[in-house]
Amino acid sequence: MVDVWLPYGKTEVCARIPTRNFLGSIEPKERLGVTDSRGEIERALSEPMGTRRLNEIAKEGDKVAIVVDDATRATPSDLMVSPLLDELNRAGVKDEDVTIIFGCGSHRAVKPDEMEKLVGEEALKKAKTISHDYKSGDQVFLGKTSFGTKVYVNKVFAEANVKVLTGDIGLHYYAGYGGGRKSVLPAVSSAETIQHNHACLLYTSDAADE
């Protein structure tokens, strides 16, 4: 018998395979990460793809909303937010005009002791922070999607002159991939919007075309 140990949550489980049935295992090729994470983020901000630099988009007097992931995601937001604030400062945006929104979607609000871990002490001192409340009645209607979803989003986010989405792109057990546009829906959207959008999972292709 061959014992094959498989990661399972925070532990491992053993699969015992008869030797005659075991052909071998294919291991992923290990890739080392960057050694200077902040430097890479600063480089990305100075060399954006398909758009102008953030400090050319934002200007003095603008209200800026930065959406970051909540405590249920292992996104290194603390590495991203500080360089973003520096880039906005170079554009003339004052710290008091920046709001960091924890994109909680339908999750609970971020606890005070979690905020520093998520975005870092420096960012907490410089910018305002709020947790999105999907049950709040103070949301702004933006319109309908092609699937008929009424889109209501966080008022602070909607009224910001400049909106910055942060996060990671990763595999998702329902949607295939998660990240990117999820920083708007569901992250800063209303209960009605989230529920209707998630229900689209059950649509057939015919229903989606109607």
Give the location of each predicted region.
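An acidic, phosphate/nucleotide-engaging active-site surface
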Residues: 110-178
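A short, gly/pro- and small-residue-rich
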Residues: 173-193
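Glycine-rich phosphate/diphosphate-binding loops that line cofactor/substrate pockets in enzymes
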Residues: 49-65, 92-95
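Short glycine-rich or small-residue beta-strand-to-loop segments that form or flank ligand, phosphate
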Residues: 63-74, 99-105
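N-terminal amphipathic/basic leader segments beginning at the initiator methionine
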Residues: 1-41
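Histidine-anchored nucleotide/phosphate-binding helix
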Residues: 74-93
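Conserved small/polar residues in nucleotide/adenosyl-binding loops
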Residues: 203-208
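Short helix/loop capping segments that flank catalytic or ligand/cofactor-binding pockets
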Residues: 15, 24-26, 75-76, 165-166, ...
